[in-house]
Structure formats: C-alpha cells, structure tokens
Swiss-Prot record:
Cell division protein that is required for growth during stress conditions. May be involved in protecting or stabilizing the divisomal assembly under conditions of stress. Pfam families: Cu-oxidase, Cu-oxidase_2, Cu-oxidase_3. It comes from Haemophilus influenzae (strain 86-028NP). Predicted to be exported by the Tat system. The position of the signal peptide cleavage has not been experimentally proven. This is Cell division protein FtsP. GO terms for molecular function: copper ion binding; oxidoreductase activity.
Length: 469
C-alpha cells in the first residue's frame, strides 16, 4: 500500500473532519433561489435604455461589494425583440472607465454594430437605431473595449439579447419568461476574503473556482412539472463547460447561437465554449429534482474536497437545480420538434474562397500575427460564402462579428444537415471547418473583428480585422 505524504494526510484529515460535521442534505438544502434578470420586451418602438454603472451586490453570497452592471443591477436585463422591428438603443456610460459594447451575434452593419470602434467615455451616450433582420436567435451584449474587455465583462457588463420571430412565437415551446423559459448566464470567478472579485490582467487565461449563474452560486428554481426551456450563455472569460444532468437524463438541444436546429436533438452532454449560447429542454414530468452540472457528478466527499482544495476546479459544479412542483403534466411526451432553417442549404452553395487560420493560444497569435487595428486581415465580399479552416495549438473558442457560419466538420466528424444551426462562436478542439456567410457590410472606420472568444487572449491581441464590402 503506498504511503501518504504529510500534506496528503493533513488534507484527508481536514476533509474527514468536514464530512463529519456537514449533514448530507445540507449542500442542496442551503441553495439560494435563482435570480432571473429583468426583462425588457421591446414593443411599438419602446427604447432600450442601458446605463452602465456601479452598484452593490453580494457576489460571494455574504459580502456586499461594488460591482458593475446595467440600470442599477449586477449584469444587464434580458432584451427581447421581434425580428422585423427596430431596436432604439440608448447606451449611457456612468462608469469611471471608457467602455465599448457589442451585441455578439447581431447581424447589423459595422456602423450600427457597436464594438471596439464605438468607445463611450465616462458620461457619454450613444443612441443608434438598429433594424433587426435575422431569425430567432440568442445573442448577448458585453464589453468589447480593446485590451480591457475581459476585466469589464468580468465586473458585470454582460446580458442576454433574445430575438423572436413568427416561428419561435408559434412553436410548441415553453415561453413564460422566468417560469418555464429561463436565461442562465454562467461566469466563473475568484474572490478574496472580503468577497471582492480577484482578477489578473495581461494573462492568457483566467479560470475562477466559483461558478455563478445569474450572479448566484449553485442556485435552485422551483418549476412546474413539464418541459423546461433553458437558454444558456457562457459569459466566462476562458472556461468552457461540459454540461449534463446529474441523473444522466437526456436533454433536447433545440438551438445554438443564431438559429434553431432543423430538428431537436437528444443529447447527454453539451460543451459550451466562452461566448457560446445554446437552448435545451429538460423534462421535469417524472422526477422531483435534477441538477444541471458541469463535468461529472460528484460524491459528497468530492464536493467537500473541492470546496476546501479546488485549485482551478470549480468548488461547486452545479449550474442549476430544478425542483418540480405540482401534478404531472398532461403533455409529458417528448415533443417532436422540427424547425425551418436555411442553415443546411449553405452546404450546396458555392464557396468564393478558402482561408486557413492557425491560432497560437500560448502566445495569443493568429497566423503568427498580433492584432493591428490599422491593418485589414480579411477582405470579404458581401453576399458571398467562404470556407475557413481553423486550427489551434490548444482548445479555444473562436468567434466572428457581423457574420454567421455553420460548422462543416470538426476533426474527423462531418456534420450532417440535421445537426446544423447558424452560429457565430465555436469550440476549436481540433481542426474545424466552418462555412461563413457575409450579409452585413463594414468599413475601415467601423470594421468587424474575428478571433478567439477567450476574452483574456482577445485583450492580448488574438484578433483580426474583417472588412465586408
């Protein structure tokens, strides 16, 4: 039998002591209720006011500290707007730093998109009117300030932006916001003893050991029996999540980033890279409770161990516990959900050009070059399709502004038509081929950017300039 070191003995003793004093149900029973962000539903030209400001909030659950957010709250409200309408935006910056904001996934021209070229100094405002001309999608808004987007997003400048269309509104889907249609914003953080966020600038990676969902660690939500719709956003700076249900139950994947899939897909797990979004349905008809978790299910011993000695691991890997209430729903069968989407049609269309991008994750380079705002890296023609081949030295997220793509293949896996959805962000673990469609114009003054979705690497310059004309 191998001998334990003194350090291992002390660690084991500490865990054993903790286990002896913590009742088994305590970890679940002491959860806080999920906070659902306020909803701004845009109707009849209602303006969307987003005021960036400091506020107070107990991020660690016990210490009230200064954080950033919108309209007096930590994080931003969920914006819901219908395709075919106009977004009358009113951005106000009441923060001590200059801020640029982008709505990732929004299909709009470079001039209206926002992004790094639209910097608001302290006290400044910007009020664009943006036509919404894309199908149902889950977008998100965040800081896009050059060399400072990670810090500002981490402080709380993030929120969900949902686009609905006729199909999504008429589909047989849960649609009661905060009841059976739940937005979940995932962030990993690290705190000091006073509950303040810890952050190291100019680092290629950041992973915190505390997982917050809508600003709450390991929350629960009471839901009616039936199907529950979870709209997931990975707003972490660098961490990807391997999501699954802790009872090994299947989930229905219905949408990714910018569109529905042609048909709902049963999945046991789902990888969500930084900046990526997905929609899943969870069947709560025949179970009393289930937890969405990241990684594998942990025993009580493992939970206590990670709370005491987590390192880069999450102290608690619970995203959300769902607790079913009431009687069995009459609609407990798995819905046969199919959706109209033109994403698969791109496979049959002509490719104007093929480009290859090699991402050096360690040094923050794309094709051995660092971001230069004065240099155009890609010039594309509006209305064309290009094949981009993505390689990365280490697994990393990749994202693009103002355009959309489908994933053609990942490694040896060639995606089938029924697996395709429009996307703007993808996890590059091995060679990944995407077909990119350019429908929006950008200029030298207001270009689009592409590059890693790891905001730490983005701030180091792992980006490129995209002009579409």
């Amino acid at each position: 039998m191998p001998r334990l070191s003194r350090r291992q003995l002390l660690k084991t003793a500490a865990i054993s002591t903790a286990l002896s004093t913590v009742p088994a149900p305590l970890l679940a029973a002491s959860r806080e209720k999920l906070v659902v962000p306020p909803l701004i539903e845009v109707r009849r030209g209602r303006p969307i006011v987003l005021t960036m400001q400091e506020t107070n909030y107990p991020l660690d659950g016990s210490h009230n500290v200064t954080v950033w957010g919108f309209n007096g709250n930590y994080l931003g409200p969920t914006i819901k707007i219908k395709s075919g309408s106009f977004a009358k935006l009113n951005y106000h910056n009441n923060l001590p730093q200059s801020v640029a904001l982008s709505i990732q996934g929004l299909q709009a021209s470079g001039e209206l998109f926002g992004g790094a070229a639209r910097v608001l100094k302290k006290g400044e405002s910007w009020a664009p009117i943006v036509p919404i001309e894309q199908p149902a999608a889950s977008c998100w808004y965040r800081s896009a300030t050059l060399a400072n987007s990670a810090y500002q997003t981490y402080r709380g400048l993030a929120g969900m932006w949902l686009i609905e269309d006729e199909q999504s509104l008429k589909a047989n889907l849960p649609n009661k916001y905060g009841v059976d249609d739940i937005p979940l914003i995932l962030q990993d953080m690290e705190f000091n003893n006073d509950g303040l966020q810890l952050f190291k600038q100019n680092q290629p990676h950041f992973v915190g050991n505390r997982l917050l969902v809508n600003g709450i660690e390991a929350p629960y939500l009471d839901v009616a029996r039936g199907w529950i719709r979870l709209r997931l956003l990975n707003a972490s700076l660098a961490r990807a999540y391997d999501l699954r249900l802790d009872n090994d139950q299947e989930m229905l994947l219905i949408a990714q980033d910018l569109s529905f899939l042609p048909k709902a897909k049963s999945v046991k797990s789902l990888v969500l890279s930084p900046g990526e979004r997905a929609e899943i349905l969870v069947n709560m008809n025949e179970i009393d409770n289930v937890s969405l978790i990241s990684g594998s299910k942990r025993s009580l011993y493992e939970k206590i161990k990670n709370m005491l000695f987590s390192g880069d691991e999450l102290a608690n890997n619970t995203v959300l516990e769902l607790r079913a209430q009431g009687q069995l729903s009459a609609f407990n069968k798995q819905p046969n959900l199919t959706f109209e989407t033109d994403a698969p049609a791109i496979l049959q269309q002509a490719v104007a050009q093929t480009r290859e991008f090699n991402i050096d994750v360690t040094n923050g380079l794309i094709n051995q070059r660092r971001f230069d705002p004065r240099k155009v890296d890609v010039m594309a023609r509006k209305g064309t399709i290009e094949r981009w081949i993505l390689n990365a030295s280490l697994p990393v997220g990749f994202t693009i502004q103002g355009a959309k793509f489908v994933v053609e293949s990942q490694g040896e896996h060639q995606l089938q038509a029924e697996e395709l959805a429009w996307k703007d962000t993808v996890w590059v673990k091995n060679k990944t081929q995407i077909l990119v469609k350019f429908d929006q114009a950008s200029s030298g003054n207001f270009p689009f950017l592409f590059g890693v979705s790891n905001l730490m690497l983005e701030d180091m310059g792992c980006l490129g300039v995209l002009m579409v004309q």
